[in-house]
Amino acid sequence: MALPKRRLSHARQGNRRAHVALSAPAVMECPQCNSPKLSHQACSVCGTYNGRTVVDVDAIAKKKADKSKGQQ
């Protein structure tokens, strides 16, 4: 089995890990309700995307409320 010939220095270790950092998500403002949303995603507050309503947020909220009420 192969073994490292020399100990890796901190500089080489850091250079290898230079590309491992996470980037912040691309957050933009919803033009409809001005809440923060992910780009290229429907708004989770008002349910619009590209100027159209694509998600019925009220129906989803009601469904969640009914589901949680039934589990009690």
Curated annotation (Swiss-Prot):
Keywords from the named record: Ribonucleoprotein, Ribosomal protein
GO BP, one annotated term: translation
A matching Pfam family: Ribosomal_L32p
GO cellular component: large ribosomal subunit
One annotated GO molecular function: structural constituent of ribosome
UniProt entry tagged with the keyword Oxidoreductase: no
Domain of life of the source: Bacteria
InterPro entries in the record: Ribosomal_bL32, Ribosomal_bL32_bact, Ribosomal_zn-bd
Entry's family note: Belongs to the bacterial ribosomal protein bL32 family.
Protein name: Large ribosomal subunit protein bL32
